[in-house]
A protein has these predicted regions:
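Bacterial N-terminal signal peptides
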Residues: 8-16
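A domain-start/cap signature at the N-terminus of enzymes
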Residues: 19-76, 168, 225-228, 238, ...
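Gly/Ser-rich "nucleophile elbow"/oxyanion-hole loop immediately N-terminal to the catalytic nucleophile
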Residues: 68-75, 120-156, 169-170
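Active-site machinery of serine-nucleophile hydrolases
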Residues: 78, 84-133
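Cell-envelope and extracellular/periplasmic
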Residues: 82-86, 138, 154, 161, ...
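Primarily recognizes the serine-hydrolase "nucleophile elbow" in alpha/beta-hydrolase
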Residues: 147-201
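The feature captures the conserved acid-bearing segment of alpha/beta-hydrolase catalytic domains
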Residues: 183-254
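Catalytic active-site module of serine/aspartate enzymes centered on a nucleophile-bearing elbow/loop
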Residues: 254-267
Length: 267
């Protein structure tokens, strides 16, 4: 075969590889890259979001950061990021913080929201958007329903992360592989566990508490109290780690936590 023939074969191979690239909700997925999607919100999620007088969101949006080498045919854990309600933060904004440590450890990092603002930024609103996003992902990648998920949040987002994780665990729709709770000063995870009773299996899920030694908002004492509360509830794998810093998210702590979740969950 001449040089021209080999060149044509190379072109055809490139085109075939390009056409087989993964997509999600009509958007291209690039390993190691970022994908933003929009999705329809089913009526039952609209009903949930509209509680407390909120508007009915018919369209949601999500940002996903993918690890290098991502292949939807292989199991890839998902790190679900939830932001605080303070300072008009959204989970899409906070997801960017977790991008580098999350993807470096081989995780997808996910943040979700609606395309409109709620009257009250309720947990039901957050749950509805997250649920609709996960449903959209599973529509294109059915196998993702079996992928482990972990919940991560900082400050007020850490409280919300625990609540959302328990609510989804109760539904039986996710395989919970960990909680990363940073800058937390109140144990909403135990409170939600008692309220929703998702089953004792959740008590085996690892919980990483990340505390800044000079944090004046969620003090080291507050973190110790949260750990003691989780221990009393019966959570068996609670780890409190302190770093030199204030009320902040420590990237190296995120990586260590994700490694620990994988080690214990064997995924």
């Amino acid at each position: 075969m001449g040089c021209k023939g080999w060149w044509l074969l190379g072109v055809f191979a490139f085109l075939a590889a390009s056409s087989d690239g993964a997509t999600l909700a009509g958007q291209s997925v690039v390993p190691g890259g970022k994908t933003e999607i929009r999705f329809a919100v089913p009526k039952y999620f609209q009903d949930l979001a509209a509680q407390a007088g909120n508007p009915r969101p018919d369209t949601g949006r999500a940002v996903l950061f993918f690890p290098s080498g991502f292949d939807p045919g292989r199991t890839t854990p998902i790190l679900i990021v939830t932001s605080t309600s303070d300072f008009n933060r959204t989970s899409l904004m906070d997801a960017e913080w977790y991008r580098a440590p999350g993807t470096a450890e081989g995780w997808i990092v996910l943040g979700t929201d609606a395309t409109i603002s709620p009257r009250i930024d309720s947990t039901q609103w957050r749950l509805a958007m997250l649920g609709a996003a996960l449903e959209t992902i599973r529509k294109d990648w059915p196998q993702s329903a079996r992928w482990p998920v972990a919940f991560a949040g900082f400050s007020g987002g850490s409280k919300r992360s625990g609540m959302l994780g328990v609510m989804l665990a109760k539904s039986g729709s996710v395989r919970v592989g960990g909680f990363f709770l940073s800058g937390i000063n109140e144990d909403r995870l135990s409170e939600s566990y008692r309220a929703y009773q998702p089953g004792r299996g959740l008590l085996e899920v690892p919980v990483w508490l990340s505390s800044g030694s000079r944090d004046t908002v969620a003090t080291p004492v507050a973190h110790n109290l949260v750990k003691a509360s989780l221990d009393r509830t019966g959570f068996k794998r609670v780890r409190l780690e302190q770093f030199d810093g204030g009320h902040q998210l420590k990237m190296s702590e995120v990586r260590r936590a994700l490694q620990w979740f994988r080690q214990l969950g064997r995924f």
